[in-house]
Amino acid sequence: MRYFTAGESHGPRLTAIIEGVPAGLSLSAEDINIELKRRQGGYGRGGRMKIESDQVEITSGVRHGKTIGSPITLNVTNRDFKNWEQIMAAQDVEDKIKKQRRLTKPRPGHADLVGGMKYEFEDLRNVLERSSARETTMRVAVGAVAKKLLHELEIEVANHVVNFGGREISSPEHLSVQEIRETAGRSDLSIFDESQAEDLRTYIDQIKKAGDTIGGIIETRVEGVPAGLGSYVQYDRKLDAKIAGAVVSINAFKGVEFGLGFEAGKRPGSQVMDEIIWSENKGYTRSSNQLGGFEGGMTNGEQLIVRGVMKPIPTLYKPLMSIDTESHEPYKASVERSDPTALPAAGVVMENVVATVVAQEICDKFNSDTINELKKALVDYKKRLSEY
């Protein structure tokens, strides 16, 4: 299973093509729209979310509500395109139009300057349009398909914010996907402890008033994953490495950890490793889950616990200093639409990205043409594991 995305932030539409989804999976546009709506929610979101109300159009790979094994094409129209039609036109236009919304003042922390240098662009909008977080719309759309597939296999995924701009959010160590959905899933801040919500909203409002932004840490948990996904035999087959790469590929994500994560480096081994236990009913399990469900790059049958750190949004309403690429004179950086934080939305993106990697691994391992064949292969595999 693989996918590609295409489209610019202010272009006519965003597109994703997914290949390798087994035939027979029930799938509707509404399944995807639910996830797209989640991405556009959350406290602290602003202008673009009021303009866009994303709706997907499925144009291939699904017939009469079922996948048919061929590539699935997903399209999301940019409703704001009518205001950008000439500026973002594919055909050549007059110079006076080209100069409209031209960007020569790169924003610190964005791809603007380095992208312009790399591709020899005079107008840095060519970089901004693709490097924008708007691209994550299609990462979520793809993830919605992956989550539907995982649900059929009794694998579930959820996320919550565990740190908001340096403020820790309290949550229990043992936390099920269902508990996350019933708490953080109903919070506009995506937090487990709603008693902290009002203070956080005040904090976000203060950050917005100051023209600044905040980041934080998001935790995604996955349940129902069997042991043995991924492999230790080559570096690029380790599933935790694949997940880490996928998470840091999300706009503004700068780090990943599993289980104890970086805390493990501060403790002796006896306080880090998860002891192995066995019972006739459950087979091999662990006494704890401090390694976040991974050993040797492989799932060990425990809940997957993945955290990603998101830097503050780099577009500031009180912009930092930059250099104009035409004059080389110092200027305050350009200001596009921005929010004080996008953590709740970023959590939805991370959740769907992690789900996609897990679904890809399952499809690659069991290589089934139909969803029924995939289900049977997974049942047989779990039976083999239970007999070890």
UniProtKB/Swiss-Prot annotation:
Stored PROSITE patterns: CHORISMATE_SYNTHASE_1, CHORISMATE_SYNTHASE_2, CHORISMATE_SYNTHASE_3
Biological process per Gene Ontology, one example term: amino acid biosynthetic process
Gene3D superfamilies named in the record: Chorismate synthase AroC
EC number in record: 4.2.3.5
Family: Belongs to the chorismate synthase family.
Function: This reaction introduces a second double bond into the aromatic ring system.
Description of how the protein assembles with itself and partners: Homotetramer.
Protein name as catalogued: Chorismate synthase
Organism: Lactococcus lactis subsp. cremoris (strain MG1363)
Gene behind the chain: aroC
